[in-house]
């Protein structure tokens, strides 16, 4: 990633627009394959870093960006939400166009609107939806290789649905958090869990008020064990009750995970 110059300036065509600071609500889509996640890291390409570089190039050095979800390396987003603040008083369409002109092709700003008072992409969110994509074909589909986990067996979708039903509602999800997870409270409310099959492709959709680190990927890894026939459907509820990560299945690879949307009031 190119260096972000501290003296970056808005192009002359927009120079007169600098004035009172503004905050924008951005909706982004990205292919996370070649990025080291959302959060800025030294000497590594990240989504937040790409947005900051693009913003500082066209909007000035004081640009700030906050994402609703700090997606991990390799994770994608269909509709991620971010807050962007700047002293450039451009309109929302100009901000979107300026960012897309400077962002790499794997990252696009789908929309930009003036943020309502007090809006913060992360703190204002009421919940998120993720999808995990699985390719069960005997031969991995080349067009899906960057966005789906290849599991070349016929998975028992009915058994997976039965198992996942035990996770709906408010629970302690310690058994599905990263082994070296943070000290964040482990209780989450899962509002919806679905398994959708289209021929050799599966999508596991999970909506919740909040998620623990690796929570979706750990749930999927365990659900696939049930789909393979390696575990009983009842086992998933037992893993949940154990609150012990070592009792669950493997962590599914990052590249099959997609942030579908972020939910806000109104």
Spell out what each predicted region is.
Residues 1-266:
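Structured-RNA-binding interfaces characteristic of tRNA pseudouridine synthases
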């Amino acid at each position: 990633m190119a260096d972000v110059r501290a003296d970056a300036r808005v192009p002359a065509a927009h120079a007169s627009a600098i004035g009172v600071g503004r905050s924008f609500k951005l909706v982004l889509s990205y292919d996370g394959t070649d990025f080291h996640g959302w959060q800025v890291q030294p000497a590594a390409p990240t989504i937040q870093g790409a947005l900051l570089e693009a913003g500082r190039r066209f909007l000035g050095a004081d640009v700030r960006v906050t994402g609703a979800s700090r997606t991990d390396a390799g994770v994608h987003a269909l509709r991620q939400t971010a807050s962007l603040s700047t002293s450039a008083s451009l309109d929302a369409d100009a901000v979107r166009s300026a960012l897309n002109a400077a962002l790499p092709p794997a990252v696009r700003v789908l929309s930009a609107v003036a943020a309502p008072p007090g809006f913060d992409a992360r703190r204002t969110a009421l919940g998120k939806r993720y999808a995990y994509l699985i390719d069960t074909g005997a031969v991995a589909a080349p067009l899906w290789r960057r966005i789906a986990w290849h599991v070349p067996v016929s998975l028992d979708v009915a058994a997976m649905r039965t198992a996942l039903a035990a996770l709906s509602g408010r629970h302690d999800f310690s058994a599905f958090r990263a082994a070296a997870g943070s000290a964040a409270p482990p209780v989450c409310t899962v509002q919806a869990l679905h398994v959708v099959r289209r021929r050799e492709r599966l999508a596991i959709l999970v909506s919740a008020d909040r998620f623990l680190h690796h929570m979706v990927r750990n749930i999927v890894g365990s659900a696939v064990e049930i789909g393979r026939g390696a575990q009983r459907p009842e086992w998933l509820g037992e893993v949940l009750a154990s609150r012990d990560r070592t009792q669950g299945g493997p962590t599914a690879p990052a590249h099959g995970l997609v942030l579908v949307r972020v939910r806000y009031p109104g």
